[in-house]
Curated annotation (Swiss-Prot):
The active site is at H108. Involved in the biosynthesis of branched-chain amino acids (BCAA). Catalyzes an alkyl-migration followed by a ketol-acid reduction of (S)-2-acetolactate (S2AL) to yield (R)-2,3-dihydroxy-isovalerate. In the isomerase reaction, S2AL is rearranged via a Mg-dependent methyl migration to produce 3-hydroxy-3-methyl-2-ketobutyrate (HMKB). In the reductase reaction, this 2-ketoacid undergoes a metal-dependent reduction by NADPH to yield (R)-2,3-dihydroxy-isovalerate. It comes from Prochlorococcus marinus (strain MIT 9215). This is Ketol-acid reductoisomerase (NADP(+)). GO terms for biological process: isoleucine biosynthetic process; L-valine biosynthetic process.
Length: 329
């Protein structure tokens, strides 16, 4: 069985006397910076001039510099910017400030896996990737818990990159829950596949198609919303807590029987073949190439699809229902 590492496996003192620059102060940047700060680390933040996040970082008690200045001052650089912005920022602001002994780190392997960023051989290159959104990483840390994380070493110039990555994971609270070792290739490919085939692409289309099927058959849109979107969380929470078996133990026999006999009518060998094609596009770089080209053109297709999806009936119905849910306010 795959080994998980915990607090006793990581040495936080390895980060003593190191200045850690968090590049970006969004969801993950905010969580990493404050968790490391609360763990006793010397943390600074690197932001572009005029960033809306600057006032928040300052009010949180952090020193803010330009990205270039932060990277010059830092021993450890953690890039927490959107994937599509990392290459340009790296080339202009980060790479010129890399020196022997510095550590370059990421929370997702996209830019390393697909060769968009090519670090010099004299720095360590590691990844620490919490498996949860930034607000959860922060909230769990503040409550004495942690969010599981992945860690990986792409380049070990110092000979200590693995131990350093584990120390960083401890600093943000990851080892409280357990951290799992991987590599940049595996993390990137599985993360992209999960997003596209299951978590975002697959689930979104499944929910919309279910909603449309009921509405087109004459059922109330509000009931279709409840059955095909709202209750997804109830089922997923059961899965997360105890797997598919516990979920099935918690639902009615009617629902469980329907699960077995109808599920494979939707998700079958043909679906799996399409999943394999999606995975191949990720593995051979097709998806990355298309995404980079889309971003270079200022995201015209993505903008069009975002607008089209925002006008779907499920969004209008959901907005109206959620406004009446006291527990969501």
């Amino acid at each position: 069985m795959t080994q998980l590492f915990y607090d006793t496996d990581a040495d936080l003192s390895l980060l003593n006397n190191k200045t850690i620059a968090i590049i970006g102060y969004g969801s993950q940047g905010h969580a990493h910076a404050l968790n490391l700060k609360d763990s006793g680390m010397d943390v600074i933040v690197g932001l572009y001039k005029g960033s809306k996040s600057e006032s928040k970082a300052v009010s949180d008690g952090l020193q803010v510099f330009s990205v270039s200045e932060a990277c010059e001052k830092a021993d450890w650089i953690m890039i927490l910017l959107p994937d599509e912005f990392q290459k340009d920022v790296y080339l202009k602001e980060i790479e010129p400030n890399l020196k022997e002994g510095k550590i370059l780190s990421f929370a997702h392997g996209f830019n390393i896996r697909f060769g968009l960023i090519k670090p010099p051989s004299f720095v360590d290159v590691v990844m620490i990737a919490p498996k949860g959104p930034g607000h959860t990483v922060r909230w769990e840390y503040q409550n004495g818990q942690g969010v599981p994380a992945l860690f990986a070493v792409e380049q070990d110039s110092s000979g200590s990159a693995r131990s350093l990555a584990m120390a960083y994971a401890k600093g943000i609270g990851g080892t409280r829950a357990g951290i799992l070792e991987t590599n940049f290739k595996e993390e990137t490919e599985t993360d992209l596949f999960g997003e596209q085939a299951v978590l975002c692409g697959g689930l979104s289309e499944l929910v919309k198609s279910g909603f449309e099927t009921l509405v087109e058959a004459g059922y109330q849109p509000e009931l279709a919303y409840f059955e095909c979107l709202h209750e997804v969380k109830l089922i997923v929470d059961l899965m997360v807590k105890g797997g598919l078996s516990q979920m099935r133990d918690s639902i009615s026999n009617t629902a469980e029987y329907g699960d077995y006999v109808s599920g494979k009518r939707l998700i079958n060998s043909d679906t799996k073949k399409e999943m394999q094609k999606i995975l191949k596009d990720i593995q051979d770089g097709t998806f990355a190439k298309n995404f980079v080209e889309e971003c270079d053109k200022n995201k015209p297709l993505m903008t069009k699809l975002r607008e089209e999806n925002s006008k779907h009936e499920i969004e209008k119905v959901g907005k109206g229902l959620r406004s009446m849910f006291s527990w969501l306010k």
